[in-house]
């Protein structure tokens, strides 16, 4: 009995809590190892409360070693002679890698917006700004295909490919350091079709042009933008670039289709009241869509020089900023040795384009640091952009025989020009867009009221020579335009004024934040005949947020929550191409006498000119509203919102029909033996004929209806694993349809002639798309090894589309003379010709088509070396995937994906 009692007395235990020495936070899963003098070991790990307990200890001296990722190891020597308590404090390892935020962060404000910091941008390893969009709710990783323009399409299901619904991209405003990117004077398109190049006039900002290495942070506003920003419909992208620093930053990136080189240097000087900075950088990108397909290549060169100077003077802070930037793209001649060579080895067509953009901007601001004063800040910005754009095309045209074409600029009857069967044709498009921007903004604060007001002026002009070609050697015989210089188009001016009030008021234990503003804007320069000229547009916008009382939940954690809502109009003005389209020329053959004797030939044509200008064109307006909620507790956050946007006046190309009367000369009475030259028209009998011909013009005929739910979740970093979980996603439903009646002409021949009627239909074009997308990112950082790696599981739970039924019956129709008649469903369907305007309804064409679940797993890895001065990074998209096959309409659809990878080396010295 005494021996058992002695054994029980000599066994002890030790317990305690492991905490962070800097903030006393608990550290779960810390490792505690105890070793006695005989090197016998006992160990334990701390639980979720940071507590540990080691039992079965004999009396003696022990060495206690405590380790935790990201903290200094603690070693203590302790004598055990009884049960004891030992609390352990671990100090963070300041030499190890600090936490890097590699995801976008949702702003918990009065509207839906996302902030992307420099660390997240670097971790994405982007080639252009478009790569950053995968961080938005509903976004997903895409391969950096740079052979065609990259367009933004916020809060939308489906891809943007139809120019009739491009207002969403055109109406997303990009702002860099307070200066907007404008492209409304872009007219760079070729009037003849070719498989070379691409024209994206009226599509908005090409995100390929924006390099990411100089970006400090970017805010993407998807909800209701401040009235400080106008000429937009869909969203705001506000980019702030780096200032100061003394590092040399170099980046080398290579992936399967592109190579990128960047080098930048910062300079910074500080004095007692003065701080000056200079930043300069150079970026070069070379992208190939496919090494075997040399036409689709794209190169980008950007150079930037930025400077700032800040002076503190009493309570005032004076800031002066300036920037000089250059962006160029260089495409060599796009000829393919396997596709574009004639029999003798010479190319049959070449294409060469160049784009050179220069920008100069400045900003001067005064800020009051005395918060008791009414005056808070006065900010003034000015910028100018000048572009030199050229497209040069050459083609060896082979028609097989001499061909008559119309080349006259004068309307009326003209003999055709006979062009040879084979010739060389050249076409040059010379564009010189020029933009000026000026803005002044005043901020006043009185109590809970913060008021900002200002005005803005924009000018657009194109000094280019336009399309230059020889009409007698046309690039294509189907060209319907004539050479027109761009510099004859008048300059356009946008004038805006705005006022906005922010207020925050405590209501009991709640607080209310509200922002209400009004923007007045108009354009001038188009001329009195345009309805839009000097027409005022008002954009009222309001957002509100209610911060609910804090609540204490289990374990003493504080829960913060809030509700927000917003509504507002957003307006986008038409571009220069929409307001001043090129005149169209058409011709109808009246006489075609083509004997074997060349001296007797004569082809007479009626030349007519169509002005596709729509003087009734209006600005596109989008009504947006949203409601949302967010939660924040102990480093965890969650937000969700529902939104709806309805733009019923989007820009699109619509068809219009006109009636053209021409002569038809009868050549049967011509006696060739009596001719000494071409026949005289006065000697020939003729009959009159009327032809319906169509042309395209810009109208406010598109409706885009967006609705959806966006959500995001962020955990705090789990210290035991040094891992953070982030998730976001969205359900989008987007409807596209025509909002004004459209024309449709059956493609049939009646009595050897084209069908004589054109139907006018209420619904002629419509589709809707929907999708549910989620993205779970697992971000792990190992400071001791200098490693950051993230795994994202991007799930497309479903996507689908449906073509909406078109109108079966027309509401009216046009006859050959151009007269409009109402369509009688009971009477006209019995008419043999008119009943062809009744369209058949095929059920299978309007079935909903759904694509089922698919998941891609993407990996990004960064290794820091030499005190974080060198980084080696790797990314692999679709390293794993789940893309099961599925059946659609009884047919098996097989799916497969291909991994895409790239790597980069980054220096910060």
Task: Give the role of each language-model region.
Residues 19-23, 30-37, 67-71, 81-122:
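Short, acidic, small-residue-rich periplasmic hinge/interaction motif at the N-terminus
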Residues 85-89, 129-132, 151-153, 175, ...:
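N-terminal periplasmic accessory domains that precede
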Residues 130, 134-188:
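Extracytoplasmic beta-strand/coil segments of soluble accessory domains associated
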Residues 179-221:
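Short acidic/polar hinge/loop motifs at secondary-structure boundaries
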Residues 215, 249-286, 292-385:
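Transmembrane beta-barrel wall of Gram-negative outer-membrane proteins
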Residues 311-329, 351-529, 708-710:
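Face-selective signature of the C-terminal outer-membrane beta-barrel domain
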Residues 508-509, 646, 664-807, 906:
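Gram-negative outer-membrane beta-barrel transporters
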Residues 647-649, 794-841, 851-856, 860-909:
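C-terminal beta-signal and adjacent terminal beta-strands/loops
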């Amino acid at each position: 009995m005494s021996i058992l009692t002695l054994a029980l007395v000599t066994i002890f235990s030790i317990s305690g809590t492991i905490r962070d020495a800097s903030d006393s936070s608990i550290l779960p899963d810390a490792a505690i190892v105890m070793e006695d003098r005989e090197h016998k070991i006992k160990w334990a790990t701390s639980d979720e409360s940071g507590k540990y307990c080691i039992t079965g200890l004999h009396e003696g001296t022990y060495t206690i070693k405590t380790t935790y990722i990201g903290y200094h190891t603690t070693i203590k020597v302790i004598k055990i002679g009884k049960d004891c308590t030992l609390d352990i404090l671990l100090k963070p390892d300041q030499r190890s890698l600090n936490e890097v935020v590699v995801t976008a962060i949702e702003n918990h404000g009065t509207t839906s917006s996302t902030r992307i910091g420099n660390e997240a941008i670097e971790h994405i390893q982007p080639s252009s700004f478009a790569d950053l969009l995968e961080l938005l709710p509903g976004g997903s990783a895409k391969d950096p295909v740079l052979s065609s323009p990259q367009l933004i399409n916020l809060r939308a299901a489906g891809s943007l490919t139809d120019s009739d619904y491009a207002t969403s991209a055109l109406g997303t405003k990009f702002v860099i350091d307070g200066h907007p990117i404008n492209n409304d004077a872009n007219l760079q398109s070729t009037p003849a079709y070719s498989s070379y190049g691409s024209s994206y006039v009226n599509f908005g900002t090409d995100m390929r042009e924006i390099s990411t290495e100089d970006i400090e942070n970017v805010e993407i506003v998807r909800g209701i933008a401040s009235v400080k920003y106008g000429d937009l419909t869909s969203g705001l992208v506000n980019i702030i670039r780096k200032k100061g620093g003394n590092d040399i930053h170099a980046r080398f990136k290579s992936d399967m289709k592109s190579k990128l080189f960047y080098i930048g240097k910062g300079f910074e000087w500080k004095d007692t009241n003065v701080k000056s900075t200079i930043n300069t950088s150079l970026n070069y990108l070379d992208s190939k869509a496919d090494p075997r397909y040399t036409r689709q290549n794209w190169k980008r060169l950007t150079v930037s020089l930025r400077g700032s100077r800040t002076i503190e003077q009493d309570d005032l802070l004076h800031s002066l900023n300036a920037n000089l930037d250059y962006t160029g793209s260089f495409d060599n001649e796009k000829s393919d040795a396997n596709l574009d060579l004639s029999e003798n080895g010479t190319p049959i067509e070449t294409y060469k384009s160049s784009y050179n953009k220069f920008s100069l901007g400045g900003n001067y601001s005064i800020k009051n640091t005395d918060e008791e004063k009414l005056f808070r800040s006065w900010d003034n910005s000015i910028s100018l952009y000048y572009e030199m754009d050229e497209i040069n095309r050459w083609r060896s045209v082979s028609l097989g025989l001499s061909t008559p074409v119309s080349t006259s600029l004068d309307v009326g009857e003209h003999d055709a020009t006979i062009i040879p069967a084979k010739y060389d044709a050249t076409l040059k498009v010379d564009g010189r867009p020029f933009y000026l921007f000026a803005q002044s903004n005043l901020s006043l604060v009185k109590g809970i009221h913060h008021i900002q007001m200002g005005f803005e002026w924009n000018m657009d002009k194109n000094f280019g020579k336009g399309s230059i070609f020889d009409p007698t050697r046309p690039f294509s015989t189907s060209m319907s335009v004539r050479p027109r210089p761009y510099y004859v188009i008048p300059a356009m001016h946008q004038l805006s004024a705005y006022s906005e009030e922010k207020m925050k008021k405590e209501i009991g234990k709640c607080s209310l934040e509200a922002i209400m503003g009004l923007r007045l804007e108009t354009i001038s320069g188009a001329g009195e005949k345009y309805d839009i000229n000097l027409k005022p547009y008002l954009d009222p916008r309001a957002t509100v947020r209610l911060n609910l009382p804090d609540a204490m939940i289990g374990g003493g954690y504080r829960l913060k929550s809030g509700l927000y809502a917003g509504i507002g109009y957003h307006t986008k003005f038409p571009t220069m191409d929409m307001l001043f389209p090129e005149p169209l020329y058409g011709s109808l053959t009246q006489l075609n006498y083509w004997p074997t004797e060349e001296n007797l030939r004569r082809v007479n044509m009626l030349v007519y000119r169509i002005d596709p200008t729509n003087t009734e064109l209006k600005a596109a307006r989008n009504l947006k509203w949203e409601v949302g909620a967010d939660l924040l507790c102990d480093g965890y956050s969650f937000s969700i919102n529902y939104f709806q946007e309805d733009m019923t006046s989007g820009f699109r190309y619509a068809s219009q029909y006109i009636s053209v009367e021409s002569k038809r000369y009868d050549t049967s009475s011509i006696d060739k033996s009596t001719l000494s030259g071409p026949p005289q028209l006065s000697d020939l009998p003729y009959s009159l004929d009327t032809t319906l011909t169509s042309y395209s013009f810009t109208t406010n005929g598109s409706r885009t209806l967006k609705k959806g739910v966006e959500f995001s979740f962020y955990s705090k970093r789990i210290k035991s694993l040094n891992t953070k979980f982030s998730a976001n996603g969205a359900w989008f439903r987007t409807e596209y349809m025509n909002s004004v009646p459209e024309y449709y002409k059956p493609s049939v021949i009646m009595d050897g002639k084209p069908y004589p009627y054109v139907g006018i239909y209420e619904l002629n074009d419509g589709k809707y798309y929907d999708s549910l997308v989620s993205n779970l990112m697992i971000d792990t950082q190992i400071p001791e090894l200098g490693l950051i790696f993230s795994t994202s599981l991007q799930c497309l739970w479903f996507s689908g589309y449906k073509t909406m039924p078109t109108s079966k019956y027309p509401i009216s129709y046009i006859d050959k003379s151009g007269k409009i008649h109402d369509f009688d469903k009971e009477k006209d369907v019995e008419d043999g010709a008119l009943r062809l305007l009744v369209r058949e309804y095929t059920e299978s064409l309007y079935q909903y088509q759904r694509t089922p679940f698919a998941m891609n797993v993407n990996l990004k890895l960064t290794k820091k070396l030499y005190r974080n001065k060198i980084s080696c990074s790797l990314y692999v998209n679709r390293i794993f995937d789940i893309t099961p096959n599925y059946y659609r309409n009884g047919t098996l659809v097989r799916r497969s994906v291909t991994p895409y990878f790239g790597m980069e080396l980054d220096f910060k010295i």
